[in-house]
Every structure is written in C-alpha cells, then in structure tokens.
Curated annotation (Swiss-Prot):
It comes from the Eukaryota. InterPro entries: AKR_Detox_Biosynth, NADP_OxRdtase_dom, NADP_OxRdtase_dom_sf. SUPFAM superfamilies: NAD(P)-linked oxidoreductase. Its EC number is 1.1.1.-. Signal peptide: none annotated. GO terms for biological process: aldehyde metabolic process. This is Putative aryl-alcohol dehydrogenase AAD15. Gene3D superfamilies: NADP-dependent oxidoreductase domain. Putative aryl-alcohol dehydrogenase. GO terms for molecular function: aryl-alcohol dehydrogenase (NADP+) activity.
Length: 143
C-alpha cells in the first residue's frame, strides 16, 4: 500500500531495541559487567536474536564495518523508497553507527540472506489475536 500510494514508512525498533549486537560487543559487555539495556525482555539475547546478530555481523564484514546496527538500518532502508527509521542510541558512537548506515547499499543477496536467518514473525498484536483465537477454538494442547 505504501509503495502504491507513494507513502513514506517510519519503522520503529529497527535495531531490535539494542538486542542486535555482535558477539564481540556482547563479550565486551559481559567483561564489563553490563547486560543489554532493554525495557522489555531478558538481559541476554534470545537464540533468534543471536542468529540475527550473527547474520548482521557477517553482512557487516562484507561491507567493511563491524556495525550490526548500521546493517540493520540499511536493511530497513532498502525495503522501500521513502523509509525514515526511528533509531535509538545513548552515546555518540551509536549516532556515528546510525549515520554510517546511510552509506551502505545492501546487495540483493545480502537482503535475501538476512530475510532467511529466522522465520518471519508477524508480531503483536497479530500473534496475540491469532494465537488467542486458535487456543479458544482448539484448546492449548493443539496449538
């Protein structure tokens, strides 16, 4: 619809709420006694977040950077003509990584690779609505 009508997109949480981090960054955090600064979820990455972070790191290396967040932003920006992602960051280094994304053009192979790392999650409220209606219809053991 956005493409058809020439609408802009402003995706939110494109960097996974700070949960997309390279293995090196996570090891450094642990060494310093830090965890992921997140309002929602555990202080460690989930298996899916680890897989996504590793894939972002692999693509980042192909583009000559260590910034998984720059790749995440570049990925979202590649999906439509007018994309203005809402980005976060609490340090100057975060801002520099966000800006770096503007100079990264992902290849079709990069995009395909990133899209196949984990199954697509349609997210809330869709998962809640569908799961709730299925459990009501079939019971929790059958969903």
């Amino acid at each position: 619809m956005a493409r058809h009508f020439g609408m802009a997109l402003a995706p939110w949480d494109v960097m996974g709420g700070g949960r997309f981090q390279s293995k090196k960054a996570m090891e450094e955090r642990r060494k310093n006694g830090e965890c992921i600064r997140s309002f929602v979820g555990a202080s460690e990455q989930t298996d899916a977040e680890i897989k996504i972070s590793e894939a972002l790191a692999k693509v980042a290396e192909e583009h000559g950077t260590e910034s998984v967040t720059a790749i995440a932003i570049a990925y979202v920006r590649s999906k439509a003509k007018n994309v203005f992602p809402s980005v976060e960051g609490g340090k100057i280094e975060d801002l520099k990584e966000n800006i770096k994304a503007l100079s990264i053009d992902l290849t079709p192979d990069n995009i395909k690779y990133l899209e196949n790392v984990v199954p697509f999650d349609i997210g809330f409220p869709n998962t809640f609505i569908v799961l709730n209606s299925l459990t009501q219809k079939y019971g929790t053991n059958n969903v």
